[in-house]
Amino acid sequence: MAKKLVGSMKLQVPAGQANPSPPVGPALGQRGINIMEFCKAFNAKTADMEPGAPCPTVITYYQDKSFTMDIKTPPASYYLKKAAKIKSGANNPSRETAGTVTAAQVKEIAEAKMKDLNANDIEAAMQIILGSARSMGIEVK
């Protein structure tokens, strides 16, 4: 017999740093998900990722209190800020630039994000990343 789906939720958790403290613990606890089981499973799955990288995670939970999780790659903005060596994007991206990245760095980011992007080839993925860079005020050379 199939498990009865109760719901799903999205969290952004730093890679390898899931712990029962807020905001993870209360979000899981109020839905009846075993917090320690989630933390151990999440940290094990993200052990090979860069520690502290924000990982969007979709958690689907069932009536028997079990769950499945889909861990996605960190957001494009995280990769772009890291490549441009900046803390945040421009306040007014149309008038000011926050930093610069090279086309090679954009391609590298697009390759890393390819499985999570809605793109058929690397060129389309690069266009998506370029759009993110433009909206953050990051210039591409």
Curated annotation (Swiss-Prot):
One of the GO BP terms on file: translation
UniProt key word Acetylation: no
Post-translational modification as stated in the protein's UniProt record: One or more lysine residues are methylated.
A single GO molecular function term of this UniProt record: structural constituent of ribosome
Alphabetically ordered keywords of this record: Methylation, Ribonucleoprotein, Ribosomal protein, RNA-binding, rRNA-binding
Pfam family, one: Ribosomal_L11_N
InterPro entries: Ribosomal_uL11 (IPR000911), Ribosomal_uL11_bac-typ (IPR006519), Ribosomal_uL11_C (IPR020783), Ribosomal_uL11_C_sf (IPR036769), Ribosomal_uL11_N (IPR020784), Ribosomal_uL11_N_sf (IPR036796)
Domain of life: Bacteria
SUPFAM superfamilies, per database record: Ribosomal L11/L12e N-terminal domain, Ribosomal protein L11, C-terminal domain
One GO CC term on file: cytosolic large ribosomal subunit
Subunit structure, interactors included: Part of the ribosomal stalk of the 50S ribosomal subunit. Interacts with L10 and the large rRNA to form the base of the stalk. L10 forms an elongated spine to which L12 dimers bind in a sequential fashion forming a multimeric L10(L12)X complex.
UniProt family annotation: Belongs to the universal ribosomal protein uL11 family.
Purpose: Forms part of the ribosomal stalk which helps the ribosome interact with GTP-bound translation factors.
PANTHER family: 60S RIBOSOMAL PROTEIN L12 (PTHR11661), LARGE RIBOSOMAL SUBUNIT PROTEIN UL11M (PTHR11661:SF1)
Designated name of the protein: Large ribosomal subunit protein uL11
Gene source species: Ruegeria sp. (strain TM1040) (Silicibacter sp.)
Gene: rplK
